[in-house]
Amino acid sequence: MSGENNSSVTEFILAGLSEQPELQLPLFLLFLGIYVVTVVGNLGMTTLIWLSSHLHTPMYYFLSSLSFIDFCHSTVITPKMLVNFVTEKNIISYPECMTQLYFFLVFAIAECHMLAAMAYDRYMAICSPLLYSVIISNKACFSLILGVYIIGLVCASVHTGCMFRVQFCKFDLINHYFCDLLPLLKLSCSSIYVNKLLILCVGAFNILVPSLTILCSYIFIIASILHIRSTEGRSKAFSTCSSHMLAVVIFFGSAAFMYLQPSSISSMDQGKVSSVFYTIIVPMLNPLIYSLRNKDVHVSLKKMLQRRTLL
């Protein structure tokens, strides 16, 4: 491909998670199982919330949106990865690669800000319950959700637009299991200063701002929980908060490891492992974490199953 610019690039080869033939089938079965759980969990959560009228509140609208984002986020990446496990040459065309990159960025960035919106919603509900229904009205909730998607679309458009101006004239093997920004830029033979600057600035905004919002929200939430007199109530609240924080730490920690570390010490092999957490593991865990201790979700699911049994 030497000497050719990006207009003549027709395809790339994805290195995948592992090049060892004996691992391909076990990895295929593992990630197929994870994807099935992700699809059932997230689509099930979204369907349950929209079919249960008593779950039509801002908290559950946010949760429904997160489940939809997680489903889309995983679907952009996992099916192609599964196909690559069972094919000899993992080829992806240039248009497919750019499309995958764009939608991956849309949903990954949207998830960052959706998690922040959900943390703010819980902060208002726990720390300012009297003002909650005024500040987090249905209109405000839908505006926040719309804003989350707009940020995702705008940031993804900027990144992908800048990627179209990059000239690819090196070895066409992408050392990753999907088309991501940093692995693609490793193949460039033109200046990528603007792209790297964008990754640093936009990445800092999309990772650090939501992270700080979530951190501040949970500091105030924990402070409020400490004032709960009931030991049982305090223990239950801490248990719920800790499970939510675990999902947040895994998502933002792995994303920060991939995008915010200096490029001189960046390792694509380590990056592939960290990417698995925020692209595949977290979308599977979120519906389990956010619904496992939720009585309203349990009641709605029980009612829906009873209705289906009667029918």
From Swiss-Prot:
InterPro entries, per database record = GPCR_Rhodpsn (IPR000276), GPCR_Rhodpsn_7TM (IPR017452), Olfact_rcpt (IPR000725)
Task: Supply the PROSITE patterns for this chain.
Answer: G_PROTEIN_RECEP_F1_1, G_PROTEIN_RECEP_F1_2
Asked whether the UniProt record includes Secreted among its keywords, one would answer no
- Segments spanning the bilayer are 26-46, 55-75, 100-120, 140-160, 198-217, 238-258, 272-292
Q: Which residues lie on this side of the membrane: Extracellular?
A: 1-25, 76-99, 161-197, 259-271
Which keywords belong to this entry? Cell membrane, Disulfide bond, G-protein coupled receptor, Glycoprotein, Membrane, Olfaction, Receptor, Sensory transduction, Transducer, Transmembrane, Transmembrane helix
Q: Per UniProt, what is one GO molecular function of this protein? A: G protein-coupled receptor activity
**Which superkingdom is the protein from?**
Eukaryota
Give the UniProt entry's GO cellular component terms.
membrane; plasma membrane
Name where it's found: Cell membrane
| Keyword Lipid metabolism set for record | no
Disulfide partners: 97-189
Q: Which residues lie on this side of the membrane: Cytoplasmic?
A: 47-54, 121-139, 218-237, 293-311
Could you tell me the Gene Ontology terms of the biological process aspect for this record? G protein-coupled receptor signaling pathway; sensory perception of smell
Entry membrane topology = Multi-pass membrane protein
- This protein's major location comes to membrane
Q: Which SUPFAM superfamilies match?
A: Family A G protein-coupled receptor-like
Q: Which residues are glycosylated?
A: 5-6
Q: Give the UniProt family note.
A: Belongs to the G-protein coupled receptor 1 family.
User: What is known about what this protein does?
Assistant: Odorant receptor.
The name of this protein is Olfactory receptor 8G1
| Originating species | Homo sapiens
